[in-house]
Amino acid sequence: MTGNLVIAALGVRVGLVCDGLDADARTAVDEAWTDAATTGAADIEVVADTGGSIRSLLSSLSQRVTLAAIEAQRGRLWMLHAAGIALPDGRVVALVGPSGRGKTTASRVLGEAYGYVSDETVAVDSSGRVHPYRKPLSIIEPGESEKAQRSPSVLGLGRLPDGELQLAGIVVLDRREGVSGAVVSDVDLGDALEELVAQSSYLTNLPAPLRTIAAHVASVGGVRRVSYTDAAALVSVLPELAVESPSRPRVSKPVSLGGSAVVGSSPDRVFRRVAPLDELPLADPDRLALFHVDAAHAGTVRVLAGIAPALWRAADGVGLEALVDAAISAYGAPGDKDATVAVEAAVDELVAADVLKVSSPAKASDPALWRIHDDVAWTGESSRV
């Protein structure tokens, strides 16, 4: 790695291998990544492309470094597609949103007043510590078709405070026209969960993804939404988006549903839960978030509401009648509606969504048989069974 740059990205030391670049291209790489430079041996390496324009080189390098760092930390950190801004005492606010939501613009404006953590990814470990990624920002410049990659210091963005950074706020960006100033509102976790999942990298590799998210959300006092038109309006409200003393995240234990025997008449169909990677109970009102992973390792979060949570919890090889009883026991009779019709409709939706599976009831087991093992000598004329 002699003569190449080592940078800090999401808690990983990434070596930028620039051996094939000319002097101008190498200087451009050094200048773009100067604020992320660190010491020590690289954990992983990314080889800079040769050929093409310097702007194309820097853009490609930024994307590849990001992907390599995220890949290196998969399953270890909660990595949010978010901008990160640090207050002087090290508390960090994560501004969450997809591409085009305004994260880079918000980073530039807020970074002039506070510390720039990242405009791309906020990586948080199990203790709530944030690992910075002071990558160059992609900037549109007049008369240029390709975006420029400018270092935070060149753009006048703030340095990070000494010491460790700690997650203190999770904020969903809501940039839209016609908003005067910045309007801050609380967001229920159940309502924010789908977006937080969508903006998380390699969530399926975390052992308890939903409960991990919930633990971090609880440690910062909940999720907030900030609606605004001009990013300048965010400067004055940023401190109130950070909790004063974030607590250490505590991941809750998994819910144990146990088993239930099938009693009463033998049903034509029985229903069972499709096992999720993780589940998260949500209160007020009673809801249940489920995170399923398909054969392609893609994750899907679903928040069950209404009578669906009770149906899912009760679906342990039982028939429709037992599910009706479970719904009535949990939420009461539905008044003038037919409980069986309502439950059957809800169950059909859960089956269609691959949350429940349906099968025929198990048949009585065949009479027990004995068999002589294949490696035992057998001299009789009858079969081994």
Regions found by a protein language model. Give the residues of each.
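Long, charge-rich, low-complexity alpha-helical segments
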Residues: 300-385
